[in-house]
Amino acid sequence: MAQFNKNQLIACRRNGTTTSDFNQTEVAEFFLMGFSNSWDIQIVHAALFFLVYLAAVIGNLLIIILTTLDVHLQTPMYFFLRNLSFLDFCYISVTIPKSIVSSLTHDTSISFFGCALQAFFFMDLATTEVAILTVMSYDRYMAICRPLHYEVIINQGVCLRMMAMSWLSGVICGFMHVIATFSLPFCGRNRIRQFFCNIPQLLSLLDPKVITIEIGVMVFGTSLVIISFVVITLSYMYIFSVIMRIPSKEGRSKTFSTCIPHLVVVTLFMISGSIAYVKPISNSPPVLDVFLSAFYTVVPPTLNPVIYSLRNRDMKAALRRQCGP
């Protein structure tokens, strides 16, 4: 087991946290206290999470397979959708399987390294999802508002670069959060009021006097979300202004059908995630934190395949072609 370095131990002593209430050794593991200790409730939680996880995996893998194999779906729009589906598959896999196992085995512990790794991937994928949703809104803007320039500007090289930048932004943000959080002393506090290692709940374990750096990182991450939200909002303002000028009702309806799913996904993910990160952890009931986190962790990856494919004629046609005559 690794021990506190000298600076961490001094910080704990200075802030009065190395009393008999807390250990003076480094936290070696955390305990996830998200759901009730009742066996019946844990079984229900595990069953619900398993069904939701299964639906999310099947739905997102189906989109990945269809957009990869079908020649009619080799367009920028479906390239971005394929990336989003792969990301959602990874995003829900970071938290849900561990939570299911914990409920079934009564073992809520997670190692210090495992917690840091889970927090990194969660922040990485959440940031990447925001970036990809922003890129997809720009793609819709170009396709609807600048159709004559669309194929020239949104070419294969541009698509690859935008995706690379999206994934890179997630990695950078994930590293920044994890390094800023896990380099600070927990001073023996190791019970997380959540079903996974979430940064806001981890911050509540730290002394307020030593989290200045992490607050700066949180402000940076929030700024990225605000910028993305502004870009998405402006894109759709232009898109809707163009759609309303389309003379035929059928043309407006068809164009709206390509935009509404993306707008619903953006609203679900960004609003729920923003509320969870902006509201003060200490002033909210633990059950509210857990259910809000469950919402933005589970709902978007599960509903995205349904939202994007339920009314999408191209996806339905691709499924029929792949399944045979």
Curated annotation (Swiss-Prot):
Main subcellular location of this protein, as a coarse class: membrane
Membrane topology: Multi-pass membrane protein
GO terms for cellular component: plasma membrane
Organism superkingdom: Eukaryota
Pfam families for this protein: 7tm_4 (PF13853)
Residues in compartment: Extracellular: 1-43, 94-117, 173-214, 277-289
Intracellular or extracellular location(s): Cell membrane
The entry's keywords: Cell membrane, G-protein coupled receptor, Membrane, Olfaction, Receptor, Sensory transduction, Transducer, Transmembrane, Transmembrane helix
InterPro entries, alphabetized: GPCR_Rhodpsn, GPCR_Rhodpsn_7TM, Olfact_rcpt, Olfactory_GPCR
Entry's Gene Ontology molecular function annotations: G protein-coupled receptor activity; odorant binding; olfactory receptor activity
Record keyword Membrane present: yes
Transmembrane segments: 44-64, 73-93, 118-138, 152-172, 215-235, 256-276, 290-310
Ranges of the Cytoplasmic topological domain: 65-72, 139-151, 236-255, 311-325
Family: Belongs to the G-protein coupled receptor 1 family.
Protein function: Odorant receptor.
PANTHER family for the chain: OLFACTORY RECEPTOR (PTHR26452)
Name of this chain's protein: Olfactory receptor 14L1
Lineage start: Eukaryota, Metazoa, Chordata, Craniata, Vertebrata
Gene behind this protein: OR14L1
